[in-house]
Curated annotation (Swiss-Prot):
Start-end of Basic residues biased regions: 1-11
Quaternary structure and interacting proteins, as annotated: Interacts with RAC1. Interacts with the exocyst via EXOC4 and EXOC8; required for the localization of both SH3BP1 and the exocyst to the leading edge of migrating cells. Interacts with CD2AP and CGNL1; probably part of a complex at cell junctions. Interacts with CAPZA1; recruits CAPZA1 to forming cell junctions. May interact with AFDN. Interacts with PLXND1; they dissociate upon SEMA3E binding to PLXND1 allowing SH3BP1 to transduce downstream signal through RAC1 inactivation. Interacts with ABL1, GRB2 and SRC (via SH3 domain).
The species this protein was found in: Mus musculus (Mouse)
Location in the cell: Cell projection; Cell junction, Tight junction; Cell junction, Adherens junction; Cell projection, Phagocytic cup
Gene name tied to this protein: Sh3bp1
Residues bearing PTM Phosphothreonine: 592
Function as written in the Swiss-Prot or TrEMBL entry: GTPase activating protein (GAP) which specifically converts GTP-bound Rho-type GTPases including RAC1 and CDC42 in their inactive GDP-bound form. By specifically inactivating RAC1 at the leading edge of migrating cells, it regulates the spatiotemporal organization of cell protrusions which is important for proper cell migration. Also negatively regulates CDC42 in the process of actin remodeling and the formation of epithelial cell junctions. Through its GAP activity toward RAC1 and/or CDC42 plays a specific role in phagocytosis of large particles.
Pro residues biased stretches: 502-516, 561-571, 609-621, 660-671
Organism taxonomic ancestry: Eukaryota, Metazoa, Chordata, Craniata, Vertebrata
Protein name: SH3 domain-binding protein 1
Name of one Pfam family that matches: RhoGAP
Length: 680
């Protein structure tokens, strides 16, 4: 038993890496040996491909069409779209697009189900039979043949050994020798019979194995067709899917373009406005002036010319992004941004900065720098004119348009604080920049110096816009923004001519007929210089005059008290207020204030707003006399001579109502606080 196992191990060791075995190699030719070596790799390849391809299936394996479609993710997506479509307006653009997409996903799901069923039938099942049935059967026959050959070789070894033993026993004499010889001969006969039977089995198994090898070699091409058919099925699946998608996309785009009533929505997408070259943008839209330049200029001409710090102050990022999107999708809705000129200016700067090539062109960068380096103004202006003439036509038109606008903006520098120098500092780096070159720090320093020269170039263009770009310009070139820039704001000369001269009205020489009391110092002086009109309702006594003066100083309007029916007593009374020391007529200095009596009636004097320099009169006598003054109704028809007589007695001078007013340098004496409160 141990010898048999050891012999088997030797056979396995002699097999080698090529897969050849001594048991089968002696029965096979060179061609069949190569076929035999391809059996194991073919079996492993078919098994692995079948396993991974089975994992690629999205539907239920082995199910019919309807069950398979329900399990597909595309069908689940189509169902979700159908449920979402019910909540949308079927006439809206989004509703129509979602409905069409839902139908396409359903169609793609059915195409995928058909593809998977075909794949299972024509590829997966043959690979499964090849890896699980056909090749294992051939390998099983090979293994059986190896075992039979091994057993046959072992039996032949035993038979040879038995024959040797039988020959050695034949030379022994005696009864025991003949018995041993007979036993050995019988054993040899039995081994010969077994060897004959085993040889027949080996021949039979060898024939079957050779037949399998021939069959495999003839069907090897058909096995390769499995993989070719896999690619054909996939190509057919993708072709059907692409056809369905192309048909649906064409129909969907037609419907969407018909539903869109704005021609610029599809003609000017965001990618065709910002970040593209100027020539491409103008050719695609059929324009002479870039859309962002014209729209932003018209918006600023409409509202933002006097905005302080225009182009210098940054706008909000969200507002700027929304403005740029509106610019690209619906330029007719830009009027809502008129109230934010900084956002409009930011959109213009963003467009100039995002151009692939600067508006003043990189090819002429050195020429611009040479023109800026000239010191003599005339030579510099001539050099700038020469460089402008060599610009491409589309660049020249847009630069002329922009410089004309910036010149108008600089005319408002007293209000917006944007001088040509400030405008050039802000916009210069967006109009011209040096070509991109990789270099050291010295080149970076040179670039920073060139940016200063760029500012000088742009400043000179703004200051000499009328010389370098002669003639007026119509800023509303395309005519699609009639509401942004009125026709009177189109050219620079029209803007300046529209400002009417400001006329200052001359002051009135005659007073208003209204007899209402004045509350301002200027009006008081005017009324003091004019004759005092007779009030149709009331005539004030001296006490009321002083009270009204106090009211004017407090900025408070109070009702006047009733006028007494009896004339005031003579100033010589012991209870009257002591008069101020009188001077002879004509001896009063005009610069010296004079105290006036309290009960001056009929005069046109008004109390000043500032207190007089003289001290107040003791209030006691006046308070006792004021209690004796009875209140009476207003008498509008009292003769003016009464007031005139009282004034004459108190004052000692001929002061009448219609007479000339006293000198303004003689203010009346202020009224005591106690008398004012009692009178009120």
């Amino acid at each position: 038993m141990m010898k048999r196992q050891l012999h088997r191990m030797r056979q396995l060791a002699h097999t080698g890496s090529s897969g050849r075995t001594p048991e089968t190699a002696e029965f096979l030719g060179e061609d069949l040996l190569q076929v035999e070596q391809r059996l194991e790799p073919a079996k492993r390849a078919a098994h692995n491909v079948h396993k991974r391809l089975q994992a690629c299936l999205q539907g239920q394996s082995g199910a019919d069409m309807d069950k398979r479609v329900k399990k597909l993710p595309l069908m689940a997506l189509s169902t979700t779209m159908a449920e979402s479509f019910k909540e949308l307006d079927p006439d809206s653009s989004m509703g129509k697009a979602l409905e069409m997409t839902c139908a396409i996903q359903n169609q793609l799901a059915r195409i995928l189900a058909e593809f998977e069923m075909t794949l299972e039938r024509d590829v997966l099942q043959p690979l499964s039979r090849l890896s699980e049935e056909e090749l294992p059967a051939i390998l099983k026959h090979k293994k059986s043949l190896q075992k039979l050959v091994s057993d046959w070789n072992t039996l032949k070894s035993r038979l040879s050994q038995a024959a040797k033993n039988s020959g050695s026993n034949q030379g022994l004499g005696g009864a025991s020798g003949s018995h041993t010889h007979t036993t050995t001969a019988n054993k040899v006969e039995m081994l010969k019979e077994e060897e004959e039977e085993l040889k027949k089995k080996v021949e039979q198994c060898k024939d079957e194995y050779l037949a399998d090898l021939y069959h495999f070699s003839t069907k090897e091409d058909s096995y390769a067709n499995y993989f070719i058919h896999l690619l054909e099925i996939q190509a057919d699946y993708h072709r059907k899917s692409l056809t369905s998608l192309d048909t649906a996309l064409a129909e969907l785009r037609d419907n969407h373009s018909q539903a869109d009533h704005s021609p610029l929505t599809t003609a000017a997408p965001f990618s065709r406005v910002y970040g593209v070259s100027l020539r491409t943008h103008l050719q695609d839209l059929g324009r002479d002036i870039a859309l962002p330049i014209e729209a932003c200029v018209l918006l600023l001409l409409s509202e933002g010319m006097q905005e302080e710090g225009l182009f210098r102050l940054a706008a909000g990022a969200s507002v700027l992004k929304r403005l740029k999107q509106t610019m690209a999708s619906d330029p007719h809705s830009l009027e809502e941004f008129c109230s934010d000129p900084h956002a409009v200016a930011g959109a213009l700067k963003s467009y100039l900065r995002e151009l692939p090539e600067p508006l003043m062109t990189s090819d002429l960068y050195d020429d611009w720098m040479r023109a800026a380096s000239l010191k003599e103004p005339g030579a510099r202006l001539e050099a700038l004119h020469d460089v402008c003439s060599r610009l491409p036509q589309e660049n020249f038109n847009n630069l002329r348009y922009l410089m004309k606008f910036l010149a108008l903006l600089a005319e408002e520098q007293d209000v917006n604080k944007m001088t040509p120098s400030n405008i050039a500092i802000v916009l210069g780096p967006n109009l011209l920049w040096p070509p991109e070159k990789e270099g050291d720090q010295a080149q970076l320093d040179a670039a920073s110096v060139s940016s200063i020269q760029v500012v000088g170039v742009v400043e000179a263009l703004i200051q000499n816009a009328d010389t370098l770009f002669p003639g007026d310009i119509n800023f509303n070139v395309s005519g699609i923004f009639p509401g942004l820039a009125p026709q009177e704001k189109v050219s620079s000369q029209q803007v300046s001519e529209e400002l009417p001269p400001v006329t200052v009205p001359a002051p009135a020489t005659t007073p208003a007929p209204t007899p209402a009391p004045a509350s301002m110092a200027v009006r008081e002086r005017t009324e003091a210089d004019l004759p005092k009109p007779t009030s149709p309702k009331v005539s004030r006594n001296p006490t009321e005059t002083a009270a009204s003066a106090e009211d004017m100083t407090r900025k408070t309007k109070r009702p006047a008290p009733a006028r007494p029916t009896m004339p005031p007593p003579q100033p010589s009374s012991t209870r009257s207020s002591p008069p101020a020391p009188s001077l002879p007529p004509g001896s009063v200095s005009p610069g010296t204030p004079q105290a006036l009596p309290r009960r001056l009636v009929g005069t046109s004097l008004r109390a000043p707003t500032m207190p007089p320099p003289l001290p107040p009169v003791p209030p006691q006598p006046a308070r006792r006399q004021s209690r004796r003054l009875p209140a009476s109704p207003v008498i509008s028809n009292m003769p003016a001579q009464v007031d005139q007589g009282v004034a004459t007695e108190d004052r000692g001078g001929p002061e009448a109502v219609g007479g000339h007013p006293p000198p303004p340098a003689l203010p009346p004496q202020p009224r005591p606080r106690g008398l004012i409160s009692e009178t009120e």
